[in-house]
């Protein structure tokens, strides 16, 4: 996979040289190219922004440097046979970045990131390149950052760890929170390691039992427990058919039951009356 990042702060992307992403780069599994947007400015101040049409506070990033930068990146990528590119635009007004989307992006051969600053990039840039390639406008949360570089780091790590051979154990992400399949709408439960005793706190007996079926059931129950406590919205929009008998028994213990009035894309589960906190 090839990743290109166009930014006015190339140094912000230094963390891509360390940890799993850095190792993937060293092994040739991931090619990362960071470009300084100001290399495509032609005035003595290296201007990348201007005042917004219609008035209002803040500045807007200009079309010309972004257009020239993206054209240059695309030309280089096409010349080296990178496959079909996709543009990833970090923005608080984008679609939520989810594990499902991370999996989808990990299957693409080439991603180009456009982290913005100020009030964002002139909309015409996104509209222009949407005629040439798929565009993903993504948000990493319901908050606003000073720029999109932090979001690039988040998305890159989420995507890179899904590439074949990047994780030491190919099964490591199977039980992740939000992983496609059985964990699609659940948070991962707690994990433990040695020593077996620490400051008077032990390990749940089931994890020491060697009984794989019981361990799997305990982990599933703990995932349900954590999800209902921390992200009840995930349970509310689940289809009860996605849960087996044991799941439903655990959800009942935790104060949840099927909603007989649930509609598709609505709330499928609700707290049992009288058990709300």
Curated annotation (Swiss-Prot):
Q: What EC number(s) has UniProt assigned to this enzyme?
A: 2.1.1.228
Q: A GO molecular function for this record?
A: tRNA (guanine(37)-N1)-methyltransferase activity
GO BP term, example: tRNA N1-guanine methylation
Task: Give the subcellular location.
Answer: Cytoplasm
Reactions catalysed, semicolon-separated, are: guanosine(37) in tRNA + S-adenosyl-L-methionine = N(1)-methylguanosine(37) in tRNA + S-adenosyl-L-homocysteine + H(+)
For this record, the Gene Ontology CC terms, alphabetical, are: cytosol
Q: At the top level of its lineage, which domain of life is listed?
A: Bacteria
Show the Pfam families listed in the entry: tRNA_m1G_MT (PF01746)
InterPro entries from the xrefs? Alpha/beta_knot_MTases (IPR029028), tRNA_m1G_MeTrfase_C_sf (IPR023148), tRNA_m1G_MeTrfase_TrmD (IPR002649), tRNA_m1G_MTases_N (IPR029026), tRNA_MeTrfase_TRMD/TRM10 (IPR016009)
Keyword Signal among UniProt keywords: no
Q: Where does S-adenosyl-L-methionine bind?
A: 140-145
Q: Which PANTHER family match?
A: TRNA (GUANINE-N(1)-)-METHYLTRANSFERASE (PTHR46417:SF1)
Concerning its family, UniProt says: Belongs to the RNA methyltransferase TrmD family.
* Primary role: Specifically methylates guanosine-37 in various tRNAs.
Please give the name of this protein.
tRNA (guanine-N(1)-)-methyltransferase
């Amino acid at each position: 996979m090839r990743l290109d990042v166009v930014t006015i702060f190339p140094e912000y992307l230094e963390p891509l040289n360390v940890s799993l992403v850095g190792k993937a780069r060293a092994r040739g599994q991931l090619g990362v190219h960071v470009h300084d947007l100001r290399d495509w400015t032609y005035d003595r101040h290296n201007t990348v922004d201007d005042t917004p049409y219609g008035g209002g506070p803040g500045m807007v990033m200009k079309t010309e440097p972004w257009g020239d930068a993206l054209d240059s990146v695309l030309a280089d990528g096409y010349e080296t046979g990178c496959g079909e590119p996709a543009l990833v635009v970090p923005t608080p007004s984008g679609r939520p970045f989810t594990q499902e989307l991370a999996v989808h992006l990990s299957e693409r051969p080439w991603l180009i990131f456009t982290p913005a600053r100020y009030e964002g990039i002139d909309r015409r840039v996104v509209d222009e390149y949407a005629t040439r390639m798929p565009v993903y406008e993504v948000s990493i949360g319901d908050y606003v950052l000073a720029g999109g570089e932090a979001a690039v780091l988040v998305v890159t790590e989420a995507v890179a760890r899904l590439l074949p051979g990047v994780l030491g154990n190919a099964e490591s992400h199977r039980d992740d929170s939000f992983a496609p399949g059985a964990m699609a709408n659940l948070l991962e439960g707690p994990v433990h390691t040695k020593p077996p005793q620490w400051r008077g706190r032990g390990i749940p007996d089931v994890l020491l039992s060697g009984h794989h079926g019981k361990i799997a059931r305990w982990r599933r129950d703990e995932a349900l427990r954590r999800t209902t406590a921390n992200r009840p919205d995930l349970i509310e929009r689940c289809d009860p058919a996605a849960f087996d008998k044991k799941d439903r028994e655990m959800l009942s213990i935790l104060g949840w039951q099927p909603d007989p009035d649930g509609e598709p894309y609505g709330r499928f589960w609700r707290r049992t009356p009288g058990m709300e906190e």
